[in-house]
Amino acid sequence: MSSISLKEIIPPQPSTQRNFTTHLSYDPTTNAIAYPCGKSAFVRCLDDGDSKVPPVVQFTGHGSSVVTTVKFSPIKGSQYLCSGDESGKVIVWGWTFDKESNSVEVNVKSEFQVLAGPISDISWDFEGRRLCVVGEGRDNFGVFISWDSGNSLGEVSGHSQRINACHLKQSRPMRSMTVGDDGSVVFYQGPPFKFSASDRTHHKQGSFVRDVEFSPDSGEFVITVGSDRKISCFDGKSGEFLKYIEDDQEPVQGGIFALSWLDSQKFATVGADATIRVWDVTTSKCVQKWTLDKQQLGNQQVGVVATGNGRIISLSLDGTLNFYELGHDEVLKTISGHNKGITALTVNPLISGSYDGRIMEWSSSSMHQDHSNLIVSLDNSKAQEYSSISWDDTLKVNGITKHEFGSQPKVASANNDGFTAVLTNDDDLLILQSFTGDIIKSVRLNSPGSAVSLSQNYVAVGLEEGNTIQVFKLSDLEVSFDLKTPLRAKPSYISISPSETYIAAGDVMGKILLYDLQSREVKTSRWAFHTSKINAISWKPAEKGANEEEIEEDLVATGSLDTNIFIYSVKRPMKIIKALNAHKDGVNNLLWETPSTLVSSGADACIKRWNVVLE
């Protein structure tokens, strides 16, 4: 039986927001980190190669809400996590991995609406039974609850503004501490957890206190950090202020966003001065530091987590994960990628572009901030170079501007011969040389266009008025004809088959018409299984038969805003191969990498490879 199965996920980077902390979580059992990105929570395994845990787990159970924080349960081997979102809901969930089928099953254990605003941090107790959840709200800024029933286990009080972070001491006697935008540090004893003490004097008045964490094992110390550049050390059992951690030889030059303990003596801090520092709590000395280029705003460090054996992962504002180890002066490795929806994709080699203007070359793992706005199209038909068109009105080659458009390019399509067709907001159809930016031909359309496809000899344009498809000859744009049957709704994507025998045209309602280009008649109108806007149509590459003749074109892969991927057949229009819920919030791009492999990207900032088995 024919099927599509998930082969690989290239996960996005953690979501970041300027002037806010992104809390990372680490699980030593699976050697994985957890973080939020968009409306999904991700678990990313740090092991290379064969492993008993999946490389990536994606949890999409928060619906339409943006996920703000994800934390592992501290119980060894439990595989439970708790995630919170901007609506104030927390969900406890777990996963199971079937290595034979390479499939991950996610199970929701419990979910609770706990706050009236975004959740900023979650902390588990060391028994894996209690949760402290904090953030913004109307009546309260946090709760203590049991993970399974949601019953209240105390009261979060003493704050007048948003709480930024919380931590439960990972040993008895149980203690907790919360820190917030009002500059206050509040200490609790429990369970049930009650207000014990509040400190508003050891962080500068009016500053934001951004993170807090008890030392591991006995919890002898608890550290708080904030925008006032101060590192305050408190007693873990009584909550009394002990001292500031400061080193005259190593002044902190920017607000501190996050901290993480490496062991019971050393902890790491990261901040807006693009520096990662490791401190000794007893001597108050900075024992090691790593500094990135401070001139780059994207190098501000907004998150950190210790991963054991003196290793640290820090998070840059641009989403890059940086790996460090005590005793090594240089970064061990970095992981870059997208953390916004991917809007353009090309394969062989794999290059992707997202709506924040970022372009990622996956073969060399290099990230480029070439544009300041959404990437419309990419062309990699020339070796060692790529051409990109963006809503910032430019065509660039490897980041160098080659053409500036008079009006914004709406949609674009590249063929493999180094040419790109562009529709602009001024209703111009432009044919450009992809790698020089020269306009080869242009024509003014009679009505606004919403989709375009370029092949070797033709340019097909979907027109908004009348929902018709107009086909131009590439050799002479003055010569054109309309396909006889219009679409049922506004055209959203067009694809001319490689042999130029067919044109597949999709609309915003999810229906696809297949036209025969020679007769200009509809070949089939039965490709109607999508329920929302068609975002991608890709023809399966032609294969050679036994006698070296090319096998007739048959299969077409389609991706839609309805999150699904379908493969339709020209010969058998009612035959369909499905991959449902392929991308949270919709499939944006879909291409055949090989005759048996599809590559897709979506609004969830993921890139996925799919195995296609045909029978």
UniProtKB/Swiss-Prot annotation:
| GO BP: any one term | barbed-end actin filament capping
Query: Where are residues bearing N-acetylserine located in the sequence?
Result: S2
Q: Where in the cell is it found?
A: Cytoplasm, Cytoskeleton; Cytoplasm, Cytoskeleton, Actin patch
GO MF annotations in UniProt: actin binding; actin filament binding
* One GO cellular component term noted in the UniProt record for this chain: cortical actin cytoskeleton
InterPro entries (alphabetical): WD40/YVTN_repeat-like_dom_sf, WD40_repeat_dom_sf, WD40_rpt
Q: Which SMART domains does this one have?
A: WD40
Q: Which UniProt keywords apply?
A: Acetylation, Actin-binding, Cytoplasm, Cytoskeleton, Repeat, WD repeat
Q: Where are the WD repeats?
A: 2-45, 46-94, 95-146, 147-189, 190-235, 236-280, 281-325, 326-363, 364-399, 400-433, 434-473, 474-516, 517-569, 570-611
Q: Does the keyword Acetylation apply?
A: yes
Does the keyword field hold Repeat? yes
Q: Which family does this protein fall into?
A: Belongs to the WD repeat AIP1 family.
Q: What else is known?
A: Present with 11100 molecules/cell in log phase SD medium.
User: How does this chain assemble?
Assistant: Interacts with actin and cofilin in a ternary complex.
As for what it does, the entry says: Involved in the depolymerization of actin filaments. Enhances the filament disassembly activity of cofilin and restricts cofilin localization to cortical actin patches.
UniProt protein name: Actin-interacting protein 1
Query: Which organism encodes this protein?
Result: Saccharomyces cerevisiae (strain ATCC 204508 / S288c) (Baker's yeast)
Task: List the lineage, top down.
Answer: Eukaryota, Fungi, Dikarya, Ascomycota, Saccharomycotina
| Name of the gene | AIP1
